[in-house]
Amino acid sequence: MSDTRETLAELEQRDAFIGRHIGPDEAEKTAMLNALGVADMETLISKTVPETIRIKEGLELDGPCTEAQALAELKAFAERNKVFKTYIGMGYYNTLTPTVILRNVLENPAWYTAYTPYQPEISQGRLEALLNFQTMIGDLTGMEMANASLLDEGTAAAEAMTMCRRVNGKNKSNVFFVAEDCLPQTIEVVKGRAEPLGIEVVVGDPQKDLQNHDYFAVLLQYPGVNGDVRDYRELIKTAHESNALAIMAADILSLTLLTPPGELGADIAIGNSQRFGVPLFFGGPHAAYIATKDEYKRSLPGRLVGVSVDANGDKAYRLALQTREQHIRRQNATSNICTAQALLAITASMYGAYHGPEGLKRIARRVHRLTTILAEGLKQAGRSVNTAHFFDTVSVATGGDTDAVYQAALQQKINLRRIDDNTLGVSLDETTTREDVAALLHVFASGKPVADVATLDSSAKDAIPAELRRQSAFMTHTVFNRYHSETEMLRYLRRLSDKDLALDRTMIPLGSCTMKLNATTEMTPVSWDGFCAIHPFAPLDQTEGYRALIADLERMLSAATGYAAFSLQPNAGSQGEYAGLLAIRAYHHSRGEGDRDVCLIPNSAHGTNPASAQMVGMKVVAVKCDDNGNVDLNDLRLKAEQHSAKLAALMATYPSTHGVFEEGIREVCSIVHQHGGQVYIDGANLNAMVGLCKPGQFGGDVSHLNLHKTFCIPHGGGGPGVGPIGVAAHLAPFLPGHSAMGETADKAIAPISAAPWGSAGILPISWTYIRMMGGEGLTEATKSAILNANYIAKRLEPHYPVLYTGSQGFVAHECIIDVRPFKDSCGVTVDDIAKRLIDFGFHAPTMSFPVPGTLMIEPTESESLAELDRFCDAMIAIREEIRAIENGEYDVDHSPLHHAPHTAADLVGDWDRPYSRERGVYPLKALKADKYWSPVGRIDNVYGDRNLVCACPPMTEYED
């Protein structure tokens, strides 16, 4: 035992989590620094980050705390929220998440730490689950094609609107008609999306007002926000006769009993899958859906899972029709959506599979029966029910009693929806019991006696009209009719997760994606009732805890970035970009400079940048990059001068997408400002800056951050995400507003998310991470991320050229290696290397972005030296295999790279390859101790798009 007595502070270990989060320990850091030839961490940082942007002081954040203390503080936030019985409805409902799904999907790192399935061979489990979602949505809506989720119902409606405008070539109108009984938050989002695109939104009664307008599409709510169920067949027929398209926003549970939109003639169906087992989460994250006719499939926004075949001709899943998406088509994409809501879509699909069609119908019939009992009881108590035909919602005329009834409900810890001064709304859900109905009746009866539920049940009548009762079957596929016992569901989920690679098994070195640790303590509070059982439109005095946490998180993010104000409403990075550009646009308009509509974007930018710019009505002008990957200052000056009178903004990622800190970033910002433009710093790479420099201090006017990158929200296999925007003081008045937020700034832009605080349910994750790390820990994490990236670059440089470095030879938090020469030397492609990495148990780095034919590697700070070396060993071994091809040991078409990934079926099948089975499946000896087997061989992408199938294939194909 040492003679030195430790201090009490040392024994308390308040900074212990920092060492849990950061992979390399001090000895490993020293070894890596020695390998780089630098004396210490500060020397490395000074050679990497330009001195002109370094901050001189530490972050103004509380010191680090223990995991137990963070959870205790979070519990205090949660206890300040009030969990009432909520009947507000408006697209959000209480639901019962089956615990087998809660534990084995939402709380399982095998699912929530996975990345978007761009590498399909190692994503077969979640691709199958998402295909189940698409099949379920297609069946329920009666449509031919559904995508793999959108961000929320309001966004889905806005996407459907712009989709109709794209595909409806017969109609040149710029009017979009919205039924007045659509969800209010949907109407707000649609109006906000329409305005910069020059679309006029008309809200009215479609039965009366539609004939008075020339319109290109109509949006109808089914059932309406106040509960009304209407037959829209004739109205849709009339729209079609006018060459207009029809969108129906349909409640997913009601479609088990109601005639589906497709059978009513709708062209597009949208909605929210939240009530299929996903908690309220104070408004999100939830998986919206969009479904349409086959003829419009190439105009669908978002991700689309399709069925293809692998190299052996066996069935395999992949993302289909990717040429629609922003990462390929940029400003010509169908949408700027990148991250969607994969994890929540998977949860909803498993809820559907667990209950099956009969179970879902039983739930729906129970909800409807209880609603009819409530309506009958209200009538017998002397209340007038305004809703004649309904599914789960009624509006009640309360006249002069409105306030009294509403307050009486609150006294009983019941939330009703206040429609207006004379009307209250009640929406029932899966969690409602007969006792709940009795309690509601007592509230509305105002002390008068009410009949008991059993008596009312005998006289209550079905409120769905005969002509709208669903006759068609749905969810007939075996996957929805097999896994109804917990044992079967548990094993199905395990089988699927075993097919995939996620952070629970391996490092995911995706450049520009920041696949860092999602710590268990950070994830724990997400499923607490105090956070997950709060309705987004609950009275503000019931959400004090959430709003205090949100305000504190905004303060933390401001401290980290140097921005004056934040909005946490954007529920994806793409939405943050969109909101930030809208704020810039509104700022210019407020100054009488509304004609500023040119957005300068470097050629190296992420595809969401130009896609977002076109969504706000801006014209994209590309700026060249120089040979070192930096913004070409001469070309920037030229373009800024050419467009000076109309320059709205520059969008620049920092550090650059080429993986370096551009030393001229202050000059870049200055050039744009000199010509009246605003500077948008894309925060995708903030993981290289926290604690070292602040975009709000070196020239940025606005940035979006990716909380699902830098601040530890998991990627979920393609969502959820949060993309908050930080702004300088002059842009603060133009942050997104929302009618449910209480007071909103006069100049606030329209909401860009359906819920006032977006995906609020996952904000505790980022708060917890920042709280446990403190300013000191966050800074150390940034330094370690830079160290890890430079170590990988150093180890790989003798084998692969590192394409870009800073002026002193170092990279930021990621590096790009050039594999293009191999195509010329021996025919090996970047795809071959990516697939071969699967045999080594790794997800490939980012392929062909931002430079075609390259790999961009980002290890993050969470990976240990052992894992970094394991990856480097794999890459070096692959280089030796390439050299063997170059030396003529075997040709590329018969090489391990060409046949990768190797499956267990390959191993036991006929082997006619010039290399051994062991070389194919165990290229390194260490793999024998822990081997990941790809469930499929290399997938044929061309076949999948030419033979597009985006629903579950028949079970005979599983058997084969």
From Swiss-Prot:
It comes from the Bacteria. The modification N6-(pyridoxal phosphate)lysine is found at K709. Transmembrane segments: none annotated. Its cofactor is pyridoxal 5'-phosphate. Keywords: Oxidoreductase, Pyridoxal phosphate. One of its GO terms (cellular component) is glycine cleavage complex. It is an enzyme of class 1 (oxidoreductase). GO terms for molecular function: glycine binding; glycine dehydrogenase (decarboxylating) activity; pyridoxal phosphate binding. It holds the Pfam family GDC-P. Its EC number is 1.4.4.2. It catalyses: N(6)-[(R)-lipoyl]-L-lysyl-[glycine-cleavage complex H protein] + glycine + H(+) = N(6)-[(R)-S(8)-aminomethyldihydrolipoyl]-L-lysyl-[glycine-cleavage complex H protein] + CO2. The glycine cleavage system is composed of four proteins: P, T, L and H. Belongs to the GcvP family. The glycine cleavage system catalyzes the degradation of glycine. The P protein binds the alpha-amino group of glycine through its pyridoxal phosphate cofactor; CO(2) is released and the remaining methylamine moiety is then transferred to the lipoamide cofactor of the H protein. This is Glycine dehydrogenase (decarboxylating). The lineage of its organism: Bacteria, Pseudomonadati, Pseudomonadota, Gammaproteobacteria, Oceanospirillales.
